[in-house]
């Protein structure tokens, strides 16, 4: 079991002003992964101030040297990949093979950006005046606040942290409050690998309400120059509005309701394979998870029959084994997903498993891997007969549920794909 707390200016924060919590393994609820000391708004402001104090000296390090630091981070993460992947599996229940691939994304991100330290080019611009020359330079933004979700607790943060650090910024990173152990482990690898000076990277462990309050206070005090956020569209809208009040543009990666169009000429076996992984990988808890299959009416029956068979045969359960998906990430997502199941109506045909809802001894799934009673495991659900006015069609569901509807013309398929109003991913 790990003890997790905020780390500000290179030093762990000893107290827990917002209390403590014991974070369970979602696949084994009687196993505590971490004892977590929660910070508050003041912790966030302190971290932003530490970042401000450290940023100028970090920016003065030549960009190619910062690039070498990024390269070292990648090598240290690579050397510790299996250990970090096991922690991802333990803390959020992501299948180990998938978790290992996620850790690899950190390494790939470092490998991509390490050379950018030599390519932070400015421009020379022609002037209309004979005695003038115009130049542009790439300068760091300053202090960057990064707030990330826990469904990708190490890969997605690297997409923010690596380029921000390379460019000479100091960072205040707030990982999800249900994946703080992964955040602390990643922080340690970044500081060890990059030899980062104290305060260049700060870790804040807090809930969403305290984080937003701290971010607002820090921005009002002029301590944060840029915000990056991955999470729900509702929270993203609030952060975007806060940034706008300070004339800043936030980097927002939000929710999705992602369609897959299956054409009459499609390879149905390939379509089923894609729908299975996209819809049910990570228990459907990705922003890019498949939401609705929009299938041509001429191949609907055959596709649904094959899809149903594939989902029924899919291994679900213990994430340390070779399953398609494991538990829900956290109890709050399990409760929310149960509300989404209430959107299934009488006009729908429910397929994919021997039941719906939580997998228990009284509501079993054939072929379940492991002990369902001790984890947040849920049946996979296919909802056939979805219409474009259904809540399940229009809204992100964030769980192991995929809708199916039909189309006649390509224009109709495109219209259906765009109707939910999200703009994240799609497949044909």
Residue ranges and their predicted role:
Residues 1-36, 68, 72, 120-148, ...:
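Terminal low-complexity tails and localization/encapsulation signals of metabolic enzymes
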Residues 30, 66, 88, 110, ...:
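Residue-level signal for inorganic ion chemistry
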Residues 30-120, 131:
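Glycine-rich loop-to-alpha-helix module at the N-terminal edge of alpha/beta enzyme cores
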Residues 33-39, 54-60, 146, 260-262, ...:
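Short, well-ordered beta-strand elements within core beta-sheets of diverse protein domains
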Residues 87-95, 125-130, 206, 321-326:
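Short linear capping/connector segments at secondary-structure termini
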Residues 122-270, 407:
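Rossmann-like NAD(P) dinucleotide-binding subdomain of oxidoreductase/dehydrogenase enzymes
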Residues 192-197, 313-315, 390:
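Short helix-capping segments at alpha-helix termini
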Residues 234-387, 409-411, 416:
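ALDH superfamily catalytic-core signature
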């Amino acid at each position: 079991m790990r003890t997790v707390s905020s780390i500000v200016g290179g030093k762990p924060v000893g107290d827990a002003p917002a209390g403590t919590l014991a974070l369970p393994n979602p696949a084994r609820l009687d196993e505590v992964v971490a004892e977590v000391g929660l910070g508050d708004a003041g912790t966030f402001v302190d971290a932003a101030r530490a970042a401000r104090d450290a940023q100028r000296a970090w920016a003065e390090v030549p960009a190619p040297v910062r690039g070498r630091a990024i390269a070292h981070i990648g090598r240290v993460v690579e050397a510790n990949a299996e250990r970090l992947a096991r922690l991802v599996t333990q803390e959020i229940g992501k299948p180990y093979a998938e978790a290992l691939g996620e850790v690899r994304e950190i390494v790939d991100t470092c490998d991509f950006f390490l050379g950018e330290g030599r390519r932070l080019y400015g421009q020379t611009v022609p002037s209309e005046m004979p005695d003038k020359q115009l130049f542009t330079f790439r300068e760091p933004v300053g202090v960057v606040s990064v707030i990330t979700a826990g469904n990708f607790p190490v890969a997605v943060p690297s997409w923010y942290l690596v380029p921000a650090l390379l460019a000479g910024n100091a960072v205040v990173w707030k990982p999800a409050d249900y994946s703080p152990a992964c955040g602390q482990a990643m922080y340690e690898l970044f500081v060890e690998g990059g030899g980062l000076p104290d305060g260049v990277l700060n870790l804040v462990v807090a809930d969403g309400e305290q984080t937003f309050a701290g971010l607002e206070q820090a921005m009002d005090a002029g301590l944060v120059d840029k915000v990056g956020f991955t999470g729900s569209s509702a929270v993203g809208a609030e952060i975007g509005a806060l940034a706008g009040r300070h004339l800043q543009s936030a980097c927002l990666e939000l929710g999705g309701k992602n369609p897959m169009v299956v054409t009459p000429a499609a390879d149905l076996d390939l379509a089923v394979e894609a729908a299975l992984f996209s819809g049910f990988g990570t228990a459907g808890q990705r922003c890019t998870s498949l939401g609705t299959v929009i299938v041509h009416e001429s191949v609907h029956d055959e596709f649904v029959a094959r899809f149903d068979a594939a989902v029924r045969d899919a291994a679900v359960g213990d994430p340390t084994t070779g399953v398609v998906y494991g538990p829900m990430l956290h109890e709050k997502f399990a409760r929310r997903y149960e509300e989404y199941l209430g959107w299934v109506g009488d006009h729908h045909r429910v397929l994919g498993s021997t039941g719906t809802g939580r997998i228990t001894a009284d509501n079993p799934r054939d072929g379940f891997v492991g002990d369902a009673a001790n984890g947040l495991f849920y049946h996979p659900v296919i909802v056939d007969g979805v219409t474009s006015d259904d809540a399940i069609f229009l809204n992100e569901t964030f769980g192991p549920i995929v809708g199916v509807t039909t189309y006649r013309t390509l224009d109709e398929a495109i219209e259906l794909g765009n109707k939910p109003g999200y703009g994240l991913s799609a497949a044909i």
